[in-house]
């Protein structure tokens, strides 16, 4: 099987980001964004998606969390796009429902080459551990755009920590499922068009 890894850096006046991604890893992760709860969520994504991930971001957290979260999403999405490559042999579609106590997240993904993001629901509290809750949805919108995937997500619950964590775990599981190689179509692109 081809090596499905990528390394992406992004440096702006607002952030300095470095990301590595191995789609065929075992969930190893090293994450440091300066936002503890966001680090925890990225670790959950890696662990439950079985991706080896490193993320380092030095951002303008004295302003707020927006630039850090968004730029990590840009870099991780770009790394995903590079790592998945021509998408030959992948399952392409996947869906997961993941609970965390009273909260449940629903995730549907199509590794289609088309950037679409839809989010249904909301978060029960405005912030969790230094992360503005709505930035969790914005992170996945940014990821979907730069990964060129279709991603439909929804959350329901009473505790924003649980809602956001279920969402990150759900995306990890769904993306892992969608990028798994189906030996019956190894080497083929999963599209009647022949290209994605």
Curated annotation (Swiss-Prot):
This is Imidazoleglycerol-phosphate dehydratase. Its EC number is 4.2.1.19. Keywords: Amino-acid biosynthesis, Cytoplasm, Histidine biosynthesis, Lyase. Disulfide bonds: none annotated. One of its GO terms (molecular function) is imidazoleglycerol-phosphate dehydratase activity. GO terms for biological process: L-histidine biosynthetic process. SUPFAM superfamilies: Ribosomal protein S5 domain 2-like (SSF54211). The gene is hisB. It is found in: Cytoplasm. Pathway: Amino-acid biosynthesis; L-histidine biosynthesis; L-histidine from 5-phospho-alpha-D-ribose 1-diphosphate: step 6/9. Belongs to the imidazoleglycerol-phosphate dehydratase family. PROSITE patterns: IGP_DEHYDRATASE_1, IGP_DEHYDRATASE_2. NCBIfam families: PRK00951.2-1, PRK00951.2-4, PRK00951.2-6. InterPro entries: IGPD_sf, ImidazoleglycerolP_deHydtase, ImidazoleglycerP_deHydtase_CS, Ribosomal_Su5_D2-typ_SF. One of its GO terms (cellular component) is cytoplasm. Pfam families: IGPD. It catalyses: D-erythro-1-(imidazol-4-yl)glycerol 3-phosphate = 3-(imidazol-4-yl)-2-oxopropyl phosphate + H2O.
């Amino acid at each position: 099987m081809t090596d499905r890894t990528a390394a992406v850096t992004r440096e702006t006046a607002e952030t300095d980001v470095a990301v590595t991604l191995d789609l065929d890893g075992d969930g190893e992760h090293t994450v440091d964004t300066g936002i503890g709860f966001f680090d925890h969520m990225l670790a959950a994504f890696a662990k439950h998606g079985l991706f080896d991930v490193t993320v380092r971001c030095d951002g303008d957290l004295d302003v707020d969390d927006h630039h850090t979260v968004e730029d990590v999403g840009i870099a991780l999405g770009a790394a995903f796009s590079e790592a998945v490559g021509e998408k030959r042999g992948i399952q392409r579609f996947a869906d997961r429902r993941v609970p965390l106590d009273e909260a449940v997240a629903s995730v549907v993904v199509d590794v289609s080459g088309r950037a679409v993001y839809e989010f249904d629901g909301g978060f029960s509290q405005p912030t969790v551990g230094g992360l503005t809750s709505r930035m969790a949805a914005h992170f996945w919108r940014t990821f979907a755009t730069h990964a060129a995937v279709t991603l439909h997500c929804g959350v329901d619950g009473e505790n924003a920590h649980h809602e956001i964590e279920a969402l990150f775990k759900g995306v990890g599981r769904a993306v892992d499922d969608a990028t798994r190689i189906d030996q019956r179509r190894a080497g083929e692109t999963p599209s009647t068009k022949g290209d994605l």
